[in-house]
Amino acid sequence: PYLNQWLSLNPAVPGSWELEVDRVRDFVRDRVSWMDAMLSYGKVRQVNGIYQLASGMDLCIFSQIVNEGGETNAKAVLVSDIDMAVYGEDFKPIGTMSNSFAGSLDGQGHTIRNLHISGGDAMGLIGYAGFCSLSNIVFDETCSVEGKNNVGMLVGAARNGTVTISGVEN
């Protein structure tokens, strides 16, 4: 059959090839959104209000939660080692000038690998920090950070409060 013939393998969609393709697109879109919701894709699991970061994607989403969602007092723990190799450009430092990170991040001794941050001011895992607690985070030798002013692997700029740091290794 030719692409412009009226033929359908799906009895629910009599008509042209375009109608059948539209039907498949609708099915896939609905199915993918259902699977995303079932698998909590795009969401980070929480236990007792504490975000459980298990992957590079989780770390990127947590950054968005703080930076764009305004949850500056959010608490998170790393529940496994995190490899950021495929998330390099997607990760933005946690905490912005208008939404300084004021929560807690406990690495629980887990290692962050292949984290490469570059940009302007306040570059680090935590971009802008204020009244926060950072503990037990390990960065391996594959991690790097570059910027203009206020640059650090863990914290770029501390503002509006005390930053408590303990057990951080490189």
Located regions from the model:
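Surface-exposed repetitive/solenoidal architectures
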Residues: V21, R25, S33-N170
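C-terminal catalytic region of ATP-dependent kinase domains
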Residues: P1-L39
